[in-house]
Curated annotation (Swiss-Prot):
MF terms (GO), sorted A to Z: aspartate-semialdehyde dehydrogenase activity; NAD binding; NADP binding; protein dimerization activity
Position of the signal peptide: none
Entry protein name: Aspartate-semialdehyde dehydrogenase
Catalytic residues of the enzyme: 136 (acyl-thioester intermediate), 276 (proton acceptor)
CDD domains for the chain: VcASADH1_like_N
Biological function: Catalyzes the NADPH-dependent formation of L-aspartate-semialdehyde (L-ASA) by the reductive dephosphorylation of L-aspartyl-4-phosphate.
SMART domains per record: Semialdhyde_dh
Keyword hit for Amino-acid biosynthesis: yes
Domain of life: Bacteria
Residue positions binding substrate: 163, 242, 269
Catalytic activity: L-aspartate 4-semialdehyde + phosphate + NADP(+) = 4-phospho-L-aspartate + NADPH + H(+)
Amino acid sequence: MQNVGFIGWRGMVGSVLMDRMVQENDFANINPIFFTTSQAGQKAPVFAGKDAGELKNAFDIEELKKLDIIVTCQGGDYTNEVYPKLKATGWNGYWIDAASALRMEKDAIIVLDPVNQHVISEGLKNGIKTFVGGNCTVSLMLMAIGGLFEKDLVEWVSVATYQAASGAGAKNMRELLSQMGELEASVKAELANPASSILEIERKVTAKMREDSFPTDNFGAPLAGSLIPWIDKLLESGQTKEEWKGYAETNKILGLSDNPIPVDGLCVRIGALRCHSQAFTIKLKK
């Protein structure tokens, strides 16, 4: 039975993964070992009745070297720190990652098996050991219109995405809820009075959003009652990195990096917890 290490299993993505693995009875076929960045030595969680002993230190390269497979949902900073150190030891196990840090590496494959199973299978034959989850909106787009790409019918795509707080992580989801709570509290009395002016309510809400004390540490701006047409950092091209991913990751997933299809658009963060939405304009070849 293979030793499989899990890092970042308590976060938003990790929690969903654990639930799914329990549903699919995946723990029956592995020896799970759980790692932590802050609570090493404490009791490990029990999934599907399997006692995994104590939590291991997620930065302990010697412990990580013992694993056949590593599944990490810890984020890009962790990957950037640990992955090169682990590979430098000669470790030759499988690294499966939800973060974006390794997506565009030459020896990594972005996994979207309903669309690029042929790329995954070829990579396994060629000894690829690093597999990375794709960008959320890129994956959704290809699940929706992947058949058009497969039939070589697409000349270009323009996409507008409307992305929930969950795409930025659990801390951002909490911040959105905190923002919602503060806005509601600021006009609680007015909302209880049907005769109160909606314009006055709106003015008070806007004033609250502009206060220095309003919680924006994670998003950098109010999201509750608003939206943010900017996700990730600015690139030299003038795109945000999230917009660039639509082009770069789409073509890598499809194995088209040498003859890429243009993909561009606008990515907007909206005040929803987990619901993403997209709108496409597609030019077809026929």
